[in-house]
Each structure stands twice: as structure tokens, then as C-alpha cells.
């Protein structure tokens, strides 16, 4: 019984996040990602930024010397 509930709630979460992306909810995430990327630059130098393109996730590395 518990297993089916967990699976169902997981599916609902996935559908919810897809809806959020279509509504432009990802803009909030990208703002936070930019802020985090800035923090990483100050701490370590090289930083990794994440771009979500549809279903795919792309990682780009930036090196600052």
C-alpha cells in the first residue's frame, strides 16, 4: 500500500515541476543559480553553471584567472 502511494506522489511531483517550467517557474531557479555561481567564483575560481533546456540539463564550466 505504501509503495503505490510513494510512486503516485513522485509522479505528481514530476508533473508539477513540468507545469512550473512551462509557467516560467524556472526563472526563479536561474536567479538563484546565478547567485550561487557568483559565490563559487569568489570561493574557488572555476565555477559550474547549470542550464535547463527542456528535459535536458547542460553543464558549462567557466574558469576565471
From Swiss-Prot:
Gene Ontology BP terms: transport of virus in host, cell to cell
Q: Where is this region: Disordered?
A: 1-47
Segments of skewed composition (Polar residues): 1-10
Keywords of the record, alphabetical order, are: Transport, Viral movement protein
InterPro entries, sorted: DUF5428
Ranges of Basic and acidic residues compositional bias? Answer: 12-42
Record has ATP-binding as a keyword: no
Name the family the entry cites.
Belongs to the carmovirus/necrovirus/panicovirus movement protein p8 family.
Q: What does this protein do?
A: Cell-to-cell movement.
* Protein name in the entry: Probable movement protein p8
- Top-down, what is the taxonomic lineage of the species of origin? Viruses, Riboviria, Orthornavirae, Kitrinoviricota, Tolucaviricetes
Amino acid at each position: 500500500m505504501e509503495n503505490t502511494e510513494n510512486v503516485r506522489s513522485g509522479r505528481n511531483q514530476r508533473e508539477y515541476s513540468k507545469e512550473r517550467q512551462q509557467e516560467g517557474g524556472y526563472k526563479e531557479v536561474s536567479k538563484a543559480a546565478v547567485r550561487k555561481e557568483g559565490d563559487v567564483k569568489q570561493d574557488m575560481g572555476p565555477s559550474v553553471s547549470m542550464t535547463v533546456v527542456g528535459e535536458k540539463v547542460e553543464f558549462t564550466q567557466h574558469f576565471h584567472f
